[in-house]
């Protein structure tokens, strides 16, 4: 509070920093100023297992929290690929592989403590499942990427650990067959917890990087079912039938906890497996999300356009909620390659907006997607700027992110 008050009076830019796992330059300091590290704000303040909620400081990580919760029979279900800090996940409105069942950070956050640019401290929301008490200030700060204040505490809704968890892998002859199966699974109303897609190229990379065994280099879906043993078996029967109708292979089951963890670790390691393809390289990741009825069309479009430019670009997707990523490993010194990547990205964004989708499902806007936000919400940005100027008139909070104020 004192730091922000001093910075505000002296018009010194401030960038809040947690674990630094964001992908869009969200925590890059692009002006002279200071970075506030929240790494020591890593305490779990309270757990109320009987009410399925907890309160944590901003730099508690998802893994730290779930380790702490294990004996209480509850868990925190939002699981991005990186071991991100909860405050950062709130700031980008993150999600992960289980969003299809448990939602995103917007779903599970019921309250925040935020330090405003002038040093004032506010508490939004509370512990209840619902409230009609005034403006929803909690949701104002979720996804604001540190541009309106510093999130220091987060009130979270938790979920009970399921009685039965079953994971399986299914291979398909084409990517379209895999995506169609995922789309139909959701449209049939199957209560699935995870339905993740890896294309053929990404399976090849993941098998080598994560040492996966007994899986094929083919377009693949990773499934996970949460519920009672009886309900899971009923869901599995329907999904197996849908997969079979789309030329899917026989399900390969990850029977025990160790096998399941290895399978999902390979999915979480996708970004790092692609990064390892280029020495000192980077990974450009798209993050489009479309209505579930348009996911097959959008993935097919991306596949065709990738083949046109002739670059290696593995694909992964949280297909259950219409979100997928095309990953380009590249050398930052190769301007020609980067130009091709951006041209592809521009085409995919245009197609996504044509399909009534969004430019970013979970990574946020940061520095890299500002021009795309102008395409998606040209009418909304003036109001966003009005809100920003009202809360942060000196523009000290993470300036230059999401949009350019001036």
Ranges and model annotations:
Residues 7, 146, 326, 392:
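Conserved, mostly hydrophobic/aromatic
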């Amino acid at each position: 509070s004192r730091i922000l008050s001093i910075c505000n009076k002296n018009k010194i830019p401030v960038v809040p920093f947690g674990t630094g796992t964001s992908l869009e330059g969200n925590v890059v300091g692009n002006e002279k100023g200071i970075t506030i590290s929240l790494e020591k704000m890593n305490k779990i303040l309270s757990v109320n297992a009987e009410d399925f909620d907890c309160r944590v400081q901003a730099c508690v990580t998802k893994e730290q929290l779930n380790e702490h919760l294990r004996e209480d029979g509850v868990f925190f279900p939002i699981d991005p690929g990186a071991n991100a800090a909860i405050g950062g996940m709130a700031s980008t409105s993150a999600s992960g592989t289980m969003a299809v069942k448990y939602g995103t950070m917007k779903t599970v956050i019921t309250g925040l403590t935020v330090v405003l640019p002038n040093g004032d401290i506010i508490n939004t929301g509370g512990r209840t499942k619902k409230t009609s008490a005034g403006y929803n200030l909690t949701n104002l700060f979720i996804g604001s990427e540190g541009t309106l204040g510093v999130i220091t505490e987060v009130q979270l809704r938790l979920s009970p650990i399921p009685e039965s968890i079953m994971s399986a892998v299914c291979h398909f002859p084409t990517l379209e067959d895999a995506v169609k199966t995922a789309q139909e699974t959701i449209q049939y109303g199957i209560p699935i917890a995870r339905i993740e897609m890896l294309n053929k190229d990404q399976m090849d990379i993941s098998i080598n990087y994560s040492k996966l065994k007994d899986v094929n280099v083919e377009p693949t879906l990773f499934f996970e079912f949460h519920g009672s043993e009886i309900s899971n078996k009923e869901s599995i029967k329907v999904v197996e039938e849908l997969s079979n109708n789309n030329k899917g292979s026989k399900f390969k089951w990850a029977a025990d906890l160790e096998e399941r963890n290895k399978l999902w670790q390979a999915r979480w390691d996708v970004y790092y497996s692609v990064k390892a393809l280029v020495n000192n390289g980077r990974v450009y990741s798209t993050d489009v999300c479309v209505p579930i009825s348009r996911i097959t069309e959008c993935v097919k479009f991306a596949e065709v356009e990738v083949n046109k430019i002739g670059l290696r670009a593995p694909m992964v997707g949280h297909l259950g909620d219409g979100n997928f990523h095309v990953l380009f490993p590249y050398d930052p010194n190769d301007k020609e390659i980067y130009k091709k990547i951006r041209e592809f990205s521009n085409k995919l964004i245009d197609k996504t907006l044509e399909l009534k989708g969004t430019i970013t499902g979970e990574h946020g806007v940061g520095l890299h997607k500002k021009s795309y936000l102008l395409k998606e919400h040209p009418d909304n940005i003036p109001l966003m700027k009005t809100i920003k100027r009202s809360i942060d008139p000196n523009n000290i909070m993470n300036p230059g992110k999401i949009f350019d104020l001036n």
